[in-house]
Amino acid sequence: MSSVFDEYEQLLAAQTRPNGAHGGGERGSTLRVEVPVFTLNSDDPEDRWNFAVFCLRIAVSEDANKPLRQGALISLLCSHSQVMRNHVALAGKQNEATLTVLEIDGFTSSVPQFNNRSGVSEERAQRFMVIAGSLPRACSNGTPFVTAGVEDDAPEDITDTLERILSIQAQVWVTVAKAMTAYETADESETRRINKYMQQGRVQKKYILHPVCRSAIQLTIRHSLAVRIFLVSELKRGRNTAGGSSTYYNLVGDVDSYIRNTGLTAFFLTLKYGINTKTSALALSSLTGDIQKMKQLMRLYRMKGENAPYMTLLGDSDQMSFAPAEYAQLYSFAMGMASVLDKGTGKYQFARDFMSTSFWRLGVEYAQAQGSSINEDMAAELKLTPAARRGLAAAAQRVSEETGSVDIPTQQAGVLTGLSDGGPRASQGGSNKSQGQPDAGDGETQFLDLMRAVANSMREAPNSAQSTTHPEPPPTPGPSQDNDTDWGY
C-alpha cells in the first residue's frame, strides 16, 4: 500500500507546480499596447523638477488615456536616474506592451522641448501640455499638490530637486501596498505611512499630493500589468542593493516590507501558529491532509523564486492555491492559537465561513495550556537546571493568574472585531451578552461577529472577578460548524 501514498504525494506535487513551469505557453497572442515613456536628456535641476511635475500631471490627468498615464507614471519613477533611458529599459521587458521612448532635451517656460529623434510634432507637444493641465476637479488650487504654488518654486540645486522628486516617488510607492488588495480602504494606512516618512525626512510636507491624485495613481497601477512588472523589478533591485548606498532604493526597500507577501497572510499565519508551534495536535489524522497540502505549498512558494512574494501584485494565478480554504482545518486551528498568543492578529479578519469551530476551539485550548509550558529545546540550549525550569514555569503561571489585576490600555477596533466603541468594559459586556444570547435570526453573520469578539476578549485582561487559578476557555462562538460542506472561497 505504500506505493499508493507515494503516488498520491506525487499527484499533489504535480497539482501544485507553478503555472508555466514546463514552458511552451502562448507567446505573442495578445495585442501589444504602445506605451509612450518620457525621458530627459538634461541634468539641470530646474529641468528635472519641471520634468517630474510634467509626468505627475499627465499621470493624474483626466484627459490622458491609459497608456499615456502608465508611461508617465514609469517616467516619474525614473526621474531620479542619471541615465533615464537605461532605467526605462528595465520596464521594456514586457510581453503585452511596447515602450516608446520620447526624449525631452529641456523645458522652456515649463514647456517640454522634444528631441528630433522622438518624432513629436509641435502640435502633439501642445496636446501634451493641454492634457497636463486637465487635473481632477478636487485639485481646486490648480496643482496636484495640497500646497499651492510649489510647482513654480525653482530648486536651489540638484539636492533640492532630488528631495522634491523623492517626496513624490515615496507617495507613489505608498499607494502600491494596497493597489491589488484593499484599495478602497487604503486612505488610513497611506496617511499613516506618509506621516512616518515625513518624520524620517524622506517626504517634505509642502509636496504632499491631493488624495484624489494618489487614488488616480493607484488605479493606474491596478489596471496596468506593465507598470506592476516594472514595480516588481524595482522592488527586487531594491532588495539586492546594499543598505545605505542609495537614497531611492533605501526607500524602495522600506516600502517592500509593506508589499512582500501581500495576500498571503493566512498562509504564513498558518505556518507560524499551526506548524511552527509543533503541538501534539498535529498528530491528529484529520489534519494529515492539510499538513500535506501545506508541505506542497511551501515547495511551490520556493519554486516561484524571487517573484513569490509579489504574486498578488503581479496577478499570478498561483496565488489562489494559497487560499485558506485549501487547508481549512489547519487554518482554523492556527487562528485559535493566534487568537490567544498574538495580540497583533486583532486587526486581521481571520473569520471565514468555512472555518471549523471545533478546530478553532482546539487551538484556543492548546494556546492556553501552553502559556506556562517550557520549550525543551531552548531550555537545553540555555542549560537550565530542573529548579530553574520549575521556577520559570511557576513565574509564568503566576503572571497568567495575576493578569486580572493589571489594567493594560488597549485600542478598540470595533469594525474589525465586531465590538462597540464604547470603551473596553462596555465592549466586554456587549460581547458577553452576545455570547450568552445569540440571535437566531443573524445566522452566519452572528457566528463571524462572535468569533471576532471572543478572540478580542481573550487578548484583553479579564475582570478581577473572572481571575482564577485555572481559567475556563471562552465559550464556543455561534453554532457548531463541524459538518459544514461549504468550502468555497
Swiss-Prot record:
Residues 1-402 are annotated as: Ncore. It is found in: Virion; Host cytoplasm. Residues 401-489 are annotated as: Disordered. One of its GO terms (cellular component) is helical viral capsid. Keywords: Capsid protein, Helical capsid protein, Host cytoplasm, Ribonucleoprotein, RNA-binding, Viral nucleoprotein, Virion. Residues 401-489, 403-489 are annotated as: Ntail. Belongs to the paramyxoviruses nucleocapsid family. This is Nucleoprotein. The lineage of its organism: Viruses, Riboviria, Orthornavirae, Negarnaviricota, Haploviricotina.
